[in-house]
């Protein structure tokens, strides 16, 4: 029970400190620096840092749901996920310099989270932390299936995640936050036994890239190329194109929003109209009074 209390305390302390740092950055930094850099670094830290608490499987899914739910409410749209930043670039919602700054901020947040994790384990606040500190140099891989299957699983998880984000991007946080949190929790429960269901290159690089069992190239194929492929497919399915790269819709035909009214075309000035059947036409030069020989 003491270990559980330590883990929960560490979880909420990390989240509270990151939220305080985010608010201070928003107040002190220029708007561009905060939106592009600081909030991404803080979200990456708050997403990766709390897992140093080493939760058991009985609490992991519940805390994962609460973490993503809190993210949706407090972190101003920051993603802490490189594939989400690349999605915004492909959707023409972010410029290339802004995207590169977000990726750099996420890398910085990842390094800060790793440092925080090692520091927490070194304190040996619980028996689990002591065990993690001893096993840090010989951790086991999160990839527990073949490389092609793992890449397919990560791509499928990322596809569902990004397609949901695209459908809910204009929805109020009160609806999108719980929906995304529930999706991430269900995905982690379903795909967790195979790849741990990261579908986040920064999170995967922080947690499992240093572990033995697979080469760096195999990890890159599963945890970087897999989510990137799933994200691109989600954008293509949702938009029919990659807006930043292609203007032409590759999948869906575009219908004209404004349709011309269906009316009879106006006759040209030189056109002669055909008289209607049964109507009389007067010849030029004849008066309206009929002659004596008319019957």
From Swiss-Prot:
Which residue spans belong to the Cytoplasmic compartment? 1-22, 75-76, 115-120, 167-174, 245-295
Q: Which UniProt keywords apply?
A: Membrane, Repeat, Transmembrane, Transmembrane helix, Transport
> Which GO cellular component terms, listed alphabetically, does the Swiss-Prot or TrEMBL entry include?
cytoplasm; membrane
Q: Which residues cross the membrane?
A: 23-41, 56-74, 121-142, 146-166, 175-191, 224-244
Q: Please indicate the residue ranges that the annotation assigns to the motif NPA 1.
A: 81-83
Q: Which residues lie on this side of the membrane: Extracellular?
A: 42-55, 143-145, 192-194, 207-223
Q: How does it assemble?
A: Homotetramer; each monomer provides an independent water pore.
Give the location of motif NPA 2 in residue numbers: 200-202
Lipid bilayer topology: Multi-pass membrane protein
Region (Disordered) spans which residues? 257-295
Instruction: Tell me which domain of life the UniProt entry assigns to the organism this sequence originates from.
Output: Eukaryota
Concerning its family, UniProt says:
Belongs to the MIP/aquaporin (TC 1.A.8) family. AQP11/AQP12 subfamily.
Say what the protein does. Putative aquaporin. Could form homotetrameric transmembrane channels, with each monomer independently mediating water transport across the plasma membrane along its osmotic gradient.
Protein species of origin: Homo sapiens
Query: Keyword Acetylation, does the record have it?
Result: no
Q: Which reaction does it catalyse?
A: H2O(in) = H2O(out)
Recorded domain comment: Aquaporins contain two tandem repeats each containing three membrane-spanning domains and a pore-forming loop with the signature motif Asn-Pro-Ala (NPA).
**Location within or outside the cell:** Membrane
KW S-adenosyl-L-methionine (keyword) present:
no
Q: Which residues lie within the membrane without crossing it?
A: 77-114, 195-206
GO MF terms listed in the record are:
channel activity; water channel activity
Q: Which InterPro entries match?
A: AQP11/12_channel (IPR051883), Aquaporin-like (IPR023271), Aquaporin_11/12 (IPR016697), Aquaporin_12 (IPR023265), MIP (IPR000425)
What name goes with this protein? Putative aquaporin-12B
